[in-house]
Every structure is written in structure tokens, then in C-alpha cells.
Swiss-Prot record:
Function per UniProt: In muscle, parvalbumin is thought to be involved in relaxation after contraction. It binds two calcium ions.
Entry keyword Metal-binding: yes
Domain of life: Eukaryota
Occurrences of domain EF-hand (ranges): 31-66
Coiled-coil residues: none
Additional record remark: Is regarded as an important allergen. On the 2D-gel the determined pI of this protein is: 3.98, its MW is: 11.33 kDa.
Record's keyword terms, sorted: Acetylation, Allergen, Calcium, Metal-binding, Muscle protein
SMART domains: EFh
Gene3D superfamilies: EF-hand
Positions with a binding annotation for Ca(2+): 44, 46, 48, 50, 52, 55
Family classification: Belongs to the parvalbumin family.
One annotated Gene Ontology cellular component of this protein: cytoplasm
Annotated protein name in UniProt: Parvalbumin beta 3
Length: 76
């Protein structure tokens, strides 16, 4: 889903940077408003125009099936 948006090395680095529970910080994860728009379209799985909490919790798994789910604290 992220082909053409991020290189494989960037994906691995991003996942490694937030592997620990409660370590995800969207401010450091997305680099530009354009990137946010691209990711929003990918994360909004049901194309509702909103990112539901469940979609957000599973966001890292969009990169890699083995990635952790975000915690409640990280999605608030």
C-alpha cells in the first residue's frame, strides 16, 4: 500500500523507531502535509473520509503484518 510513498529502508526505520509500546509520535512520523494526505488515503480503509480509532490502531500493520497495534494512549 505504501509503494511509491516510502522506500523499504524508510519503512524498516520507521517501524524500528516506534517498536516499543507508547513510543509512536505522529509529529516525527510524517514529514510533510503532502505525506499526511497520502497516508490518510491509505489508512482510511473504508474510504469514509475519517480515520476510525480501530483503523488508526492497526496503522503500523499496514507497513508490516508483524508490527504492533498502537495503544489507546497513542490513538487519542
Amino acid at each position: 500500500a505504501f509503494a511509491g510513498v516510502l522506500a523499504d529502508a524508510d519503512i524498516k526505520a520507521a517501524l524500528a523507531g516506534c517498536a516499543a509500546a507508547d513510543s509512536f509520535n505522529y509529529k516525527t512520523f510524517f514529514k510533510s502535509p503532502e505525506e499526511v494526505k497520502k497516508f490518510f488515503a491509505i489508512i482510511d480503509q473504508d474510504h469514509s473520509g475519517f480515520i476510525e480509532e480501530e483503523e488508526l490502531k492497526l496503522f503500523l500493520q499496514t507497513f508490516s503484518a508483524g508490527a504492533r497495534a498502537l495503544s489507546d494512549a497513542e490513538t487519542k
